[in-house]
Amino acid sequence: MFEIRNLEKTFRLHNQNQAEIPVVSNVNFNVQAGECVALTGASGSGKSTLLRLIYGNYLAGDGTILVDGTNVVGADPRTILELRRTTLGYVTQFLRVLPRVPTIRVVAEPLLQAGCEVDAAEERARYLLEKLRIPENLWELSPLTFSGGEQQRVNIARGFAYDYPALLLDEPTASLDPANRQTVLDMIIDAKDRGCAIIGIFHDEAARRTVCDREIDVTHFAAAA
């Protein structure tokens, strides 16, 4: 599902005499359907950068990123958007949504973009919001008014609303209470069971042991940069 070959990324600082900061180099790994792989390494080693490269938020300097056969490197915007609509989900650490959009619609949006009927999409959204213990009286409010923990759970619900074949997870259990943490781990296991390929960042070692099949130490790629 994921196939990454000879991937490189260097940031160029245009406002500092074109200074170059190598981030990752010679990145090579695969992730199969039904497998969850954790990216590990110290802060600043390039874990989040790798996720953003795979999602197409950053342009790669060189290499190949295949997601279900689509090469993200060099893909045009339309191809990237289609990949995100039907194949590749991304649960980030921070919720980014338009103001005043109700929470239930925020969670349902990936399903609507994939062509799901409104009633079915909102039913799925209600199920996930209840599962993640978001009080029902908040569902019609914008999640931008919520606490940090509530926003994180809305973000997780949104990321798991559509059954993506591939998922990127950036600290999905950070700052969650024990009950919600376990719920999210169960959701990850369920996604694996249906064949989803997952790449994640988990600073929670117990969570890594629970859901991840193996680990990739990103510092090896950073050291070669």
Regions from the language model: what does each represent?
Residues 55:
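Helix-to-loop junction immediately C-terminal to a conserved catalytic motif
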Residues 63-71:
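Conserved ABC transporter NBD signature motif
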Residues 71, 120-137:
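Conserved ABC ATPase "signature" region
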Residues 72-89, 193:
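ABC ATPase NBD coupling module
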Residues 101-112:
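Q-loop/switch helix immediately C-terminal to the Walker
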Residues 142-146, 150:
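Conserved ABC ATPase signature
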Residues 159-160:
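ABC ATPase C-loop
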Residues 167-170:
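Catalytic Walker B motif of ABC-type/P-loop ATPase nucleotide-binding domains
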